[in-house]
Amino acid sequence: MKRAIILVLDSFGIGAAGDAEKFGDVGSDTMGHIAEQCDKGLADNGNRKGPLTLPNLSKLGLAMAGKESTGKLAAGLDADAEIIGAYGHAAELSSGKDTPSGHWEIAGVPVLFDWGYFSDKENSFPKELTDRILARANLSGYLGNCHASGTQVLDDLGEEHMKTGMPIFYTSADSVFQIACHEETFGLDNLLTLCQIAREELEDYNIGRVIARPFIGAGKGQFERTGNRRDLSLEPPAITVLQKLVEEKNGHVHSIGKISDIYAGCGITQKTKATGIPALFDATKEAITAASDNTIVFTNFVDFDSAYGHRRDVAGYAAALEYFDGRLPEIMEMLQEDDILILTADHGCDPTWPGTDHTREHIPVLVYGHKVPAGSLGLRDTFADIGQTLAEYFEISDMEYGKSFL
């Protein structure tokens, strides 16, 4: 029986990629800089203190993968851990450093075209676009129209939104159109309908995602984004390994978290919504228990990115990594003889880096299974090596990109 479990630690880069200069990200290192801050005692909070402690990930080769990526061992990680898995680091072939590009490339389909972007920091959106969205949604106006941090924009405009009923439109360095609305005063269903309208109107702009950003709270300083986020993505430009598994083997792909949204539902046969790392872990375990032959269980742990990377919260990121590491054996112990477990990321988001955007980094590729030989996989030229490996593992037709590391 063949089953693959893929865990994406969203934004957990392990060192600047070779083309980081194009993105202004030379020297970025999500893992290394978190470890450095922890080692210096600068990432202590109520949940953690001291050096970054990731014994289980280190046994899978994380520390060594980071060393191969950057040339140095991340501070505090165990250089002498007995390696029980295959480890490597992968460069991104895709043109961007965004979530869809990273995930699609993992599934064997790199993004070789350029996304559309709203580059202007202020007055970011064309008037003809927003006019059409407002007319179709029967709205009198909107707020924002700028690049913004998702939490700061709520403090800046949340109260006005509640008073006027006008949605908050904003973007970032990614190919995104984001809409924030209060779940109670505006309504979640109304927000999702508005986002669908925006998705349709953005067809000619080649924007990767429309993101619904619902929030709650009574006023400034009290607003919180909820777990009802929704990503409306374009479909991948070619068939992914997920779709091939379903079509060629009558297989199953169980999405946990936002995976289904990222692939616009393509190749997904079952989806489970869960919010927060603990709930995502629980849902993943339940899915593994129920998984049959020719199944992929695919989980995205978005909080590393959304709650800690973008928020530049080093201590929070470190605590979340240590929690993840502590629970990882629960999944490892569930693996049957022929199963494989792959841990990876989709891009970087260095919480010590200027700004609030993603960083162009290598991603870890950690592979574990009873039949997986331990040792280095080296530098992989594309994230698509993961997709090609899955194609070989499940004995389906080859992907166009990538080389298997099995």
Curated annotation (Swiss-Prot):
It is found in: Cytoplasm. GO terms for molecular function: magnesium ion binding; manganese ion binding; phosphopentomutase activity. Pathway: Carbohydrate degradation; 2-deoxy-D-ribose 1-phosphate degradation; D-glyceraldehyde 3-phosphate and acetaldehyde from 2-deoxy-alpha-D-ribose 1-phosphate: step 1/2. Its cofactor is Mn(2+). It catalyses: 2-deoxy-alpha-D-ribose 1-phosphate = 2-deoxy-D-ribose 5-phosphate; alpha-D-ribose 1-phosphate = D-ribose 5-phosphate. Mn(2+) 2 binds at residues 305, 310, 358. Pfam families: Metalloenzyme. Its EC number is 5.4.2.7. Mn(2+) 1 binds at residues 10, 346-347. Its main location: cytoplasm. SUPFAM superfamilies: Alkaline phosphatase-like, DeoB insert domain-like. Binds 2 manganese ions. InterPro entries: Alkaline_phosphatase_core_sf, DeoB, Metalloenzyme, Phosphopentomutase_DeoB_cap_sf. GO terms for biological process: 2-deoxyribose 1-phosphate catabolic process; 5-phosphoribose 1-diphosphate biosynthetic process; metabolic compound salvage; nucleotide metabolic process. NCBIfam families: deoB, PRK05362.1. Belongs to the phosphopentomutase family. This is Phosphopentomutase. It comes from Aliivibrio salmonicida (strain LFI1238).
